[in-house]
Amino acid sequence: MIDTNIKGLVYTTRLLLPRLIAHGRGASIVNLGSVAGNYPYPGGNVYGGTKAFVGQFSLNLRNDLIGTGVRVTNLEPGLCESEFSLVRFGGDQAKYDATYAGAEPIQPQDIADTIFWIMNTPAHVNINSLELMPVSQTWAGFAIDRNRG
């Protein structure tokens, strides 16, 4: 997770940045964060930490690129139905199904459509961050242990 969400992001950005800067005005970077980077949940410490990194990296990169015309956005999806949960649950289809049961989660196409919209905003507009959640989800995820006296 750290290799993909942090190192992969940094190395890929470093590789592509010279071309984006050369392109100038209208060039765009859309990083995929997560609402887990803003709102903790039980069992999400490493994942949430890596996605918090994506958010700070994006904001700092935007500052570093001021004057270049390159835009930087951190897109932060919430509950999205994808193979991510199947991998997370070690292939347990029942847990995967339970994660999305009755929730009408975001679909990968929703995220793709949002990225398309971000990329097609006017060149003078930068969307710093954007949270995207299904209407069935909220960020009020406080964990409460009700089994303690």
Model features per residue range: what roles?
Residues 15-26:
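A short helix-coil junction within the Rossmann-fold of NAD(P)-dependent oxidoreductases
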Residues 13, 50:
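Active-site helix of classical SDR
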Residues 39-45, 103:
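Active-site loop immediately N-terminal to the catalytic Tyr-X3-Lys motif
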Residues 18, 63-66:
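Alpha-helical segment proximal to the catalytic Tyr-Lys
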Residues 74-78, 93-141:
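C-terminal helical subdomain
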Residues 34:
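Residue(s) in the substrate-gating loop at a strand-loop-helix junction
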Residues 1:
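A hydrophobic alpha-helix adjacent to the NAD(P)-binding/active-site core of NAD(P)-dependent oxidoreductases
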